[in-house]
């Protein structure tokens, strides 16, 4: 029997409340001190762990201290600096390209709306929503691999398409909770609902998860 939207919304409330109680301090785990540093870190985080990114940016942000430094740097040198994050050639080009546009078109300020953010080289909805939520306090959802996997397990979505998932979840979870939800799901995905070996017996939402094996 197909679950009604009203019932999904009720389950979504339960999921949020339970995870919030379990991970009250959940927050962005990327290291940054400015909007532009978060932009760089988020670009580097694609197909890479936040832990690795933080190891790299610790020295990177001492070497490149402003958007201008990234915009006018030697991209081959930048590529070497971010090598351990993977896909270093593409990521370095994206970072330099985005930084150049920020410097030349936005006065060195990272844009504060989705359309302008996704116009930056290498910036998609995931990175843009991260910036909007973390820096500008605009309710938004970052659909990463944890969100895709766990929301499918919860049967709140039946697709792997990040944009479709984003809009489906917007209809289920309260607007004010969108940013926090992402961090809760990421923490839960790392600690309990681990890919290929979820710890359903230790899960605080196993009673309302259709995929739970207890």
Stretches found by the model and what they are:
Residues 2-214:
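Catalytic cores of DNA base-excision repair glycosylases
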